[in-house]
Amino acid sequence: MQRVTITLDDDLLETLDNLSQRRGYNNRSEAIRDILRGALAQESTQQHGTEGFAVLSYVYEHEKRDLASRIVSTQHHHHDLSVATLHVHINHDDCLEIAVLKGDMGDVQHFADDVISQRGVRHGHLQCLPKED
């Protein structure tokens, strides 16, 4: 491991220290390594041809104009990417779904875009993890 020196604005350093404390990092280096790994993983997973895993989470109103049916149709259209899906009833109107996906990251991103862009889907988030050798 190599030691490097970086220069940060006071505000950015304070934000880093607050993040480090909230997440329980022992030092700034651990926090910066995790932030950098996350940025590099996200960058590498945005390309077709990169295999990996992803977690897609989103909230939707289950009774909104065929939305549940459209989401299921999209899931079946991309069935080869789906490893597992967790469905949670948040309240009378809203559902949370969490899908674990595996495959070409370009295809995974396309699937996530198809789901998240549906009218009535809120809080859509895709977390990608490149396949490690």
Curated annotation (Swiss-Prot):
Record bears the keyword DNA-binding: yes
Swiss-Prot/TrEMBL cofactor(s): Ni(2+)
Cofactor remark from the record: Binds 1 nickel ion per subunit.
GO MF, one annotated term: nickel cation binding
Keyword Secreted: no
Keywords, comma-separated and alphabetical: DNA-binding, Metal-binding, Nickel, Repressor, Transcription, Transcription regulation
InterPro entries the record matches: Acetolactate_synth/TF_NikR_C (IPR027271), ACT-like_dom_sf (IPR045865), Arc_rbn_hlx_hlx (IPR013321), CopG (IPR002145), CopG/NikR_regulator (IPR050192), Ni_resp_reg_NikR (IPR022988), Nickel_NikR_proteobac (IPR014160), Ribbon_hlx_hlx (IPR010985)
Any single biological process term in GO: response to nickel cation
Gene3D superfamilies assigned to the protein according to its UniProt record, in alphabetical order: ACT-like. Chain A, domain 2, Met repressor-like
Superkingdom as given in the UniProt entry: Bacteria
Binding residues for Ni(2+): H76, H87, H89, C95
Pfam families, A to Z: NikR_C (PF08753), RHH_1 (PF01402)
NCBIfam families for the chain: nikR (TIGR02793), PRK02967.1 (NF002815), PRK04460.1 (NF003381)
Description of how the protein assembles with itself and partners: Homotetramer.
Function description: Transcriptional repressor of the nikABCDE operon. Is active in the presence of excessive concentrations of intracellular nickel.
Homology family: Belongs to the transcriptional regulatory CopG/NikR family.
Protein name, as recorded: Nickel-responsive regulator
Gene that specifies this protein: nikR
